Amino acid sequence: MAQDVGHAAPDTATIFVAQVVWTQRAMADVYAIVGHISEQSRPLAAQRLAKRLFDTGASLATYPERGRVSTQGRREIVAISPYVLRYRIVGDRVVIGSVRHGARRPI
């Protein structure tokens, strides 16, 4: 006789999903970085970098506190070395304020 082993209850945990917002400055940073790499005759590398930057930003929707705490309440996360996304968590939003080369002085 078959035994009823039942089914596991569905996971009722709520997953927090933040809205990720890219500021005009952050978008300008991405375009400048990608443009610079493209000008060096490396358009495919520039496209891959842009995808990685945007994917890292999108990943902050489910894990906004993943980046390390930086200055003035900001956080930062390395998207692909040496490029760093600098952002703030504001309520239920992640606001990406800039994208910087890790060797550049913060402003």
Swiss-Prot record:
Pfam families: ParE_toxin. Disulfide bonds: none annotated. It comes from the Bacteria. The keyword rRNA processing does not apply. Keywords: Toxin-antitoxin system. Disruption phenotype: No visible phenotype when deleted singly or as the relBE4 operon. Toxic component of a type II toxin-antitoxin (TA) system. Its toxic effect is neutralized by coexpression with cognate antitoxin RelB4 but no other ParD or RelB antitoxin. PANTHER family: PLASMID STABILIZATION SYSTEM PROTEIN, TOXIN PARE1-RELATED. Belongs to the RelE toxin family. This is Toxin RelE4. It comes from Caulobacter vibrioides (strain ATCC 19089 / CIP 103742 / CB 15). The gene is relE4.
